[in-house]
């Protein structure tokens, strides 16, 4: 390739000198008149040769040429745009139908609605950084920045770093977009501990893959602006993240083993901690207390979530397009601060902490089997317990769900879900279940993709 580049440069340079050689055969009378034009032609030829060499070198290295040289010709006209400079732009539509007999369980109360349209813009910025932007569009939040981060891909020592907003590396399913799940919604333990749409954070993330014991491991650590969203309608007298102890800190250790050519296992542990604004109530009235222009005064209380997750995958080499199996389980425990410190400026008021206390745990187990090239069946069992310190009554949620998943192509997905839920004690999910505390839900989902970002079948 280097010989080709050198030859191309010499040919162009030689072409630029041809007029200079022909000048020796001309008369001395007009040689001076043509000297300036020859010099300009030679300069243009040299510039063109340099441009060609740089473009060839950039092409051989797999990197885009300099933007100032793209589409520029000697005449000043603009040529074709280098496709390497164009980012990958895609969109994913997520449509959900709720046929639950007791009424819709969707946040907006709709029976059929576009839950979200996600627009992704992704590209390599230069040889050192990659940028990813994911925008979520829906009727409730309009346009929201779901993720926007810059990834450093050329750090020494095998490290990779991100800065911006990203999905927090807590557990297994929280690291996937909701439309990429093999279920319509996140498991109940993730929805309760991390949020209905999962947990994101804005800050710095560092990871590294290594294999000191003969199998692959990955360590991930993050520092973000705050741990999730504050309690709805609650504000503190000073920012939760005013001190470094108010930031959100997370860590995750992933372990990966190949059991055979057709199967592998992943076992991971993760934790996240930070402070969140939790409500305070007036000790005399027992209700939330608005003061000094705040809808409801709150206090910064520490909350920690720890968990472990397990994933087994099987896909035979001879039938990889038609058969596969996934078994996944995840356990989480939420630990809440019992008596957070009340800010000094609130000591003159009679306040009582009204946020979550103690700890509670939950888990899910999910299995998915591929029947044909495009058809999958799945089932999930959820359990979520409530801390008995919340109101003295205790409580739990148990759910069993079944799924039928169909991929017409790699750019579309159709899914049907049936879920039976039973609650006792504290109402955790559906506040209007009545004396039976049971609910049957029927959800339908259609997901489609435009562009390179598409639903993942496995």
Whereabouts are the PLM-identified features?
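N-terminal periplasmic/intermembrane-space "pro-region" immediately following the signal or transit peptide
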Residues: 18-104, 445, 449-450, 454-458
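Outer membrane beta-barrel
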Residues: 74-229, 245-261, 361-381
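Outer-membrane beta-barrel pore domains and translocons
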Residues: 92-96, 136-138, 166-168, 222-226, ...
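Outer-membrane beta-barrel translocator domains and adjoining extracellular loop/strand segments
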Residues: 101-107, 138-149, 175-179, 231-238, ...
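Short sequence motifs at beta-strands and strand-loop junctions characteristic
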Residues: 109-113, 141-142, 195-198, 243-247, ...
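Detector for outer-membrane/organellar transmembrane beta-barrel domains
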Residues: 262-389, 398, 450
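Outer-membrane beta-barrel "beta-signal"
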Residues: 308, 406, 436-458
């Amino acid at each position: 390739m280097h010989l080709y580049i050198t030859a191309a440069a010499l040919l162009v340079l030689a072409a630029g000198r041809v007029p200079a050689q022909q000048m020796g055969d001309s008369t001395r009378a007009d040689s001076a008149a043509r000297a300036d034009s020859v010099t300009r032609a030679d300069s243009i030829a040299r510039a063109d040769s340099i441009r060609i060499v740089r473009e060839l070198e950039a092409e051989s290295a797999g990197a885009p040429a300099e933007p100032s040289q793209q589409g520029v010709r000697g005449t000043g006209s603009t040529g074709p745009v280098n496709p390497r400079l164009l980012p990958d732009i895609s969109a994913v539509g997520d449509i959900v139908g709720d046929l639950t007999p007791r009424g819709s369980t969707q946040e907006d109360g709709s029976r059929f609605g576009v839950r979200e349209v996600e627009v992704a813009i992704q590209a390599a910025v230069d040889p050192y950084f990659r940028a990813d932007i994911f925008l979520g569009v829906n009727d409730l939040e309009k346009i929201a920045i779901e993720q926007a981060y810059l990834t450093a891909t050329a750090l020494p020592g095998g490290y990779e770093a991100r800065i911006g907003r990203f999905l927090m590396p807590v557990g297994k399913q929280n690291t996937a977009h909701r439309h990429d799940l093999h279920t319509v919604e996140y498991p109940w333990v993730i929805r309760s501990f991390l949020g209905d749409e999962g947990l994101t954070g804005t800050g710095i993330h560092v990871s590294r893959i290594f294999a000191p014991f003969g199998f692959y491991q990955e360590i991930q650590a993050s520092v973000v602006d705050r741990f999730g969203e504050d309690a709805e309608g609650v504000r503190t007298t000073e920012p939760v993240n005013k001190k470094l102890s108010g930031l959100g800190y997370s860590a995750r250790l992933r372990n990966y083993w190949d059991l055979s050519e057709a199967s592998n296992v992943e076992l991971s542990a993760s934790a996240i901690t930070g402070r969140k604004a939790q409500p305070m109530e007036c000790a005399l009235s027992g209700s939330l207390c608005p003061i000094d222009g705040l809808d409801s005064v709150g206090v910064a209380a520490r909350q920690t979530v720890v968990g472990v997750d397990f994933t087994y995958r099987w896909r035979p080499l001879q039938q990889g397009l038609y058969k596969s199996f996934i078994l996944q389980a995840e356990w989480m425990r939420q630990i809440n601060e019992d008596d957070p410190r009340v800010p000094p400026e609130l000591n003159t008021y009679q306040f009582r902490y009204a946020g979550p206390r103690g700890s509670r745990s939950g888990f899910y187990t999910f299995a998915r089997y591929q029947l044909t090239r495009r058809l999958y069946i799945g089932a999930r069992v959820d359990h979520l317990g409530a801390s008995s310190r919340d109101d003295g009554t205790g409580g739990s949620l148990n759910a069993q769900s079944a799924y039928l998943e169909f991929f017409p192509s790699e750019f579309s997905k159709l899914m049907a879900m049936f879920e039976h839920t039973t609650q006792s004690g504290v109402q955790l999910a559906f506040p209007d279940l009545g004396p039976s505390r049971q609910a049957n839900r029927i959800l339908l989902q259609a997901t489609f993709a435009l562009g390179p970002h598409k639903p993942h079948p496995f």
